[in-house]
A protein has these predicted regions:
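Beta-sheet-rich non-transmembrane sensory/scaffold domains
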Residues: 15-636
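C-terminal segment of classical bacterial N-terminal signal peptides
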Residues: 5-14
Length: 636
């Protein structure tokens, strides 16, 4: 990557990129002919490595711990309930395991939805229902949940029914749940170990999903489609077509960049699809836009567009394969594309600068896309790529070498890479997994120019997040202490702030939503506030446990005038766990613990336990505890 940057990449004339978007196919016949001709010219190679197998149903313990004119037009109104989710973009909600609706928490847990009333200063279990359609066996994975108005949406993936499953429920002011309807989107499995499949802006539900293509099968049967489950049986649906699927993408909404269209060696094995569904409609309605490319991808959702980075899109020989970056506007207008080198590590490698109409992307020479476990490892040179949105066109534009800013790395190995944009800075670190080192180099890049700062954190780095106007890096040292170090970004050059350690502890979960920081009401810059994060004291567990969730407590830290101090923990009572008669989605792929801050109240969700704490004099103590686990006899 460094050699390519130094050599420079010559762009096509800027006017071409500014004026031309991607060209769509004119008909199903043209698309089918194109795919068949490409298959004859360039038979698909055997994959370099096999993808992980479909998850096996495991019975886990029941209480296992842009510019304004580009904004998407949405229907309905934004939910008035405060956000309790640590999202990448402030105006874009992400599918999660706990949301708030009025005076109730809504929890998605092991194939069921639960509501807990918290509005009267107490905690009381109200209702629970299956998260899947009535009359089915729940043979699917239900991973994400969102709340829009008086609807609760559960997102899952069904291998039996063939695609992304969307289940809608009604919730009333008393917290009672009622099943409404279910739909399936034709798609591959969406699971990523770090990214989230669904986003919500207003009442618009947004998905990015890949679809494998078979050039010799009927193309109409492979295009994005939606079907509604009728409730009669598993195989009978309402809609068009023999299998009940109704197309939501005509061939005239399938695009391909000109360089890929002309290059018979380019990989076009996957249809990358962005789907927008109107949740406010009595019957779910969706529209989709699709682009062709290889199967290696990362995606990021801003308030205006979905960005999809396709690795190894155009062969260059001797490791010089070029990537294709797509910009797919959420308003349904024509997408654009451009070429680049390398690839992002995860969704946090992206940042849309709406004011400057630009996109920043952190890239490495070798990255493997978003899919299961791939973001955990990357390698090679790193750079910060800045692209004007006007460069997205017909795909002919190749980002020039001057668009990349080389980024320094720490000592080898550097395959565990973490990055986060915050304010006008990029903060990143590269090294081993935390716990294998007693210090880590943290780099701070001023986005407005200036020298890159290098800061030594006295522990490894497994997480980078935002605390007010500053950053926090979290990770273990070789003594099994979990370290929290603030990186002060405001009020002078970036510098190491305060550090606090939790002895004999590790992160209980890796996902971004497991972390939350609430600034104090009188501290708008976040210099004072409270931090929450699931931790585990069981240090003998498999290293993979942190990716699936192994939280045995939620730890809290106080920050006062930028000084960090442990505030205590709210712990799970695993010894009181009982059989929940789990029927579906019985593995916590998205974890099971979250800190929750609502007004001046503080909660810890750990499996089926919801614990409220009271903060006083910098310490948290248990105030109330609720076990909302269902029993076999009480199950609906």
């Amino acid at each position: 990557l460094a050699a390519l940057i130094c050599a420079g990449a010559l762009p096509v004339p800027q006017a071409q990129a500014q004026t031309a978007g991607l060209r769509a196919f004119t008909s199903d016949q043209e698309l089918a002919t194109f795919l068949k001709r490409r298959a004859r010219q360039h038979p698909a190679p055997m994959p370099a490595d096999l993808p992980p197998p479909a998850p096996t149903m495991v019975m886990a313990p029941s209480s296992a711990p842009g510019a304004a004119n580009e904004a998407v037009v949405v229907t309905g109104t934004r939910a008035s309930s405060p956000s309790i989710t640590n999202t990448q973009e402030a105006d874009v909600d992400e599918g999660g395991i706990v949301k708030v609706h009025g005076n109730h928490l809504v929890v998605l847990r092991r194939g069921r939805l639960f509501t807990v009333r918290i509005g009267d200063g107490t905690m009381r279990a109200v209702d629970h229902v299956d998260a899947f359609p009535p009359g089915t066996n729940g043979d699917a994975w239900y991973d994400e949940m969102l709340v829009s108005g008086d609807r609760v949406i559960v997102v899952g993936y069904s291998y039996e029914r063939g695609g992304t499953e969307i289940n809608r429920f009604r919730i009333d002011a008393a917290g009672r749940l009622r099943y409404e309807d279910s739909y399936h989107l034709r798609s591959n499995d969406y699971y990523s170990s770090s990214n989230y499949a669904s986003r919500l802006i207003g009442s618009q539900l947004i998905f990015y999903t890949p679809l494998d293509l078979d050039p010799y099968a009927p193309i109409v049967a492979q295009l994005p489609a939606l079907r509604r489950w009728t409730g009669k049986d598993l195989d009978r649906y309402a809609g068009l077509g023999k299998d009940g699927f109704q197309r939501i993408t005509p061939a005239t909404r399938v695009y391909v960049p000109e360089p890929i269209r002309r290059n018979s060696e380019a990989d076009i094995s996957t249809l990358h699809t962005v789907t927008v569904c109107d949740l406010a409609a009595p019957r779910l309605s969706c529209r989709a836009t699709a682009v062709l490319g290889s199967d290696s991808s990362n995606f990021y959702v801003s308030g205006n567009a979905v960005y999809v980075w396709i690795g190894e899109a155009l062969p260059g020989g001797k490791g010089h394969d070029r990537a294709m970056l797509y910009r797919m506007p959420l308003d349904g207008s024509r997408p654009g594309a451009l070429q680049a080198w390398g690839g992002p590590v995860d969704q946090f490698s992206f940042r849309e600068d709406r004011a400057a109409r630009a996109l920043d992307v952190v890239v490495r020479a070798e990255s493997r896309g978003d899919w299961m476990w791939r973001p955990e490892v990357s390698s090679g040179d790193a750079a910060l790529l800045r692209l004007p949105l006007s460069a997205f066109g017909n795909g002919a534009y190749l980002a020039p070498g001057r668009a990349y800013r080389p980024l320094p790395l720490g000592k080898q190995p550097d395959w565990s890479f973490h990055n986060r944009f915050m304010g006008r800075h990029l903060v990143y670190s590269a090294g081993r997994f935390a716990g294998e080192q007693n210090e880590a180099a943290v780099f701070v890049v001023p986005l407005d120019g200036g020298l890159i700062g290098r800061i030594r954190a006295p522990h490894g780095v497994d997480r980078i997040d935002i605390i007010g106007n500053d950053a926090v890096v979290i990770g273990n040292d070789a003594k099994d202490r979990l370290g929290f170090s603030s990186i002060e970004l405001a009020g002078g050059p970036p510098r190491l702030g305060d550090t606090s350690f939790l002895p004999a502890a590790r992160e209980g979960e890796r996902r971004s939503q497991a972390f939350f920081y609430r600034p104090d009401p009188g501290s708008p810059n976040g210099a004072s506030g409270t931090l929450g994060l699931p931790v585990t004291r069981d240090l003998g567990k498999s290293p993979a446990a942190r990716f699936l969730g192994s939280g045995s407590a939620v730890a809290f830290l106080r920050r006062d005038a930028r000084r960090l101090a442990p505030a205590g923990e709210l712990a799970a009572h695993a010894e009181t766990a009982r059989d929940d008669d789990c029927k579906a989605s019985c593995v916590d792929w998205y974890g099971n613990a979250r800190p929750i801050f609502l007004g001046d109240r503080v909660f810890a969700l750990m499996g089926y336990e919801l614990v409220e704490g009271k903060l006083s004099n910098g310490r948290i103590r248990e105030y109330a505890r609720l076990d909302f686990a269902p029993t076999a006899t009480a199950r609906k």
